[in-house]
Amino acid sequence: MTKYVGAIDQGTTSTRFIVFDRKGQIFSVAQREHEQIYPRPGWVEHNAVEIWLNTRTVILEALEKKGLSTSDLAAVGVTNQRETALLWDRKTGEPLYNALVWQDTRTDQLVARYAKEGGQDRLRAKTGLPLATYFSGLKLHWILDNVPGARAKAEAGDALFGNIDTWLLWNLTGGPDGGIHITDVTNASRTQLMDLEKLAWDEDILKLFNIPAACLPRIVSSSERYGTGKGPLEGVTLSGILGDQQAALFGQACLHPGEAKNTYGTGNFMLMNTGEKPFPSTCGLITTVGYKLGDAKAVYALEGSIAITGALVQWLRDNLGIIKNSADIEPLARTVSDNGDVYFVPAFSGLYAPRWDDSARGVVCGLTRFANKGHIARAALEATAYQTREVLEAMVKDSKVAIRELRTDGGMVVNELLMQFQADMVNVPVVRPKVIETTALGAAYAAGLAVGYWASTDDITQNWGVDRRWHPHMAAEQREHLYGSWNKAVERSLGWAR
């Protein structure tokens, strides 16, 4: 019997291949970063070919590290940065343009146009999403309108559209030589083109955005046998697809209504399982598909998305040179006892949930001659916690469910200063699991369940375990003073891009 399940974790800054055992423990991992392309202010692109080549490389490296072959893998799943979208030539496999990253704001004029005609929430009832630059349907709209020849190819069926999951699955199954053109329900729900209840492309929205159905992938469940790999995964069953945040929800064993997790990565993403019916938000959150296992009913989620959290640490490293490595942020922040009344609002791509303001831009408030780089570092970390509190409060108000603990995952959860401050700010315990790579683990679970490697979701629940728990210690008066000052800083960030 095969011993392992693999997961491709294609994120905003890097691609990893992780091999898991039956207990959900990491057996092998390889990782490669890819270039971030910034052609203009607000524009963010990725080279999709570079991402595909990195994917091939990390698969081979992770297997070679432990002397594994593809025959040791029962199945492989894919999880991906959602909303990042591209259009490519069906015959050659060449992208017609760089992938437009989820943070990219070039569709702001399209958002304004459609919002003016019918309001920002005109598509929320069908899609669960407000009009925003975040989602990939309008990114496709921009490519079709601005890349020479793109629309003609798309209408003829000679160009294929997809988020990164679709791009990788197509290449992994042969590319121009019979590649499978599919996307799962979680990724499709991030395009703003899918009807949440019907789980199908919506003809009225396609007509509104002038998008040809011929270029769209077939929508499938998150866990089923899609096909067999070629190239680096020759002969391996490909059987799991989940957008990264839904994968983390699944990997965190949030399998019952009311259970929630918060991922700390390039951005922050809090998701709460709401069961088998879409739960409309009135507090600025989005309604999305959580997962769908084969023929079972889809499970839905409420989500609060924060654009810039870990990316702010990268910005301090790469753009300002305040730190040499991302891990240096915590010791630098610990050189000061508090934030020195400095507040950082990292609205580099506007503000996402619950405010949804594309006009906001980043600001630092409260600077005096007393402030130093330690205060800047601390303010950057605290910004993540303030934004998370804002989303958590909206989620509690929407769902009418009190969150008793916050399950966390992602790269930033190794930062103990941040985790303690997060517990203080939301006033509930913050929990870090033993395996923090829950995004990749969720994709592995989806793939493994489809082929019987794991018998049921009970195995997922049994595998989950606590590594550390942080309890709130901050006095209520101090907590509310800090949060009130943060909100004052947010008001200063609004309206800059108008």
UniProtKB/Swiss-Prot annotation:
Notes on how activity is controlled: Inhibited by fructose 1,6-bisphosphate (FBP).
Residues that, per the record, bind sn-glycerol 3-phosphate: 12, 82-83, 134, 244
GO molecular function list: ATP binding; glycerol kinase activity
Enzyme class, spelled out: transferase
Keyword ATP-binding belongs to the record: yes
Binding site for ATP: 12-14, 266, 310, 314, 411
GO CC annotations, alphabetized: cytosol
UniProt-listed InterPro entries: ATPase_NBD (IPR043129), Carb_kinase_FGGY (IPR000577), Carb_kinase_FGGY_CS (IPR018483), FGGY_C (IPR018485), FGGY_N (IPR018484), Glycerol_kin (IPR005999)
EC number: 2.7.1.30
Pfam families in the cross-refs: FGGY_C, FGGY_N
Function: Key enzyme in the regulation of glycerol uptake and metabolism. Catalyzes the phosphorylation of glycerol to yield sn-glycerol 3-phosphate.
Keywords associated with the record: ATP-binding, Glycerol metabolism, Kinase, Nucleotide-binding, Transferase
Protein family per UniProt: Belongs to the FGGY kinase family.
UniProt-annotated binding residues for glycerol: 82-83, 134, 244-245
Binding positions (ADP): 12, 16, 266, 310, 411, 415
Pathway per the UniProt entry: Polyol metabolism; glycerol degradation via glycerol kinase pathway; sn-glycerol 3-phosphate from glycerol: step 1/1
GO biological process, one term: glycerol catabolic process
Matching PROSITE patterns: FGGY_KINASES_1, FGGY_KINASES_2
The organism of origin for this protein: Azorhizobium caulinodans (strain ATCC 43989 / DSM 5975 / JCM 20966 / LMG 6465 / NBRC 14845 / NCIMB 13405 / ORS 571)
Source species, domain of life: Bacteria
Reaction catalyzed: glycerol + ATP = sn-glycerol 3-phosphate + ADP + H(+)
Protein name per its UniProtKB record: Glycerol kinase
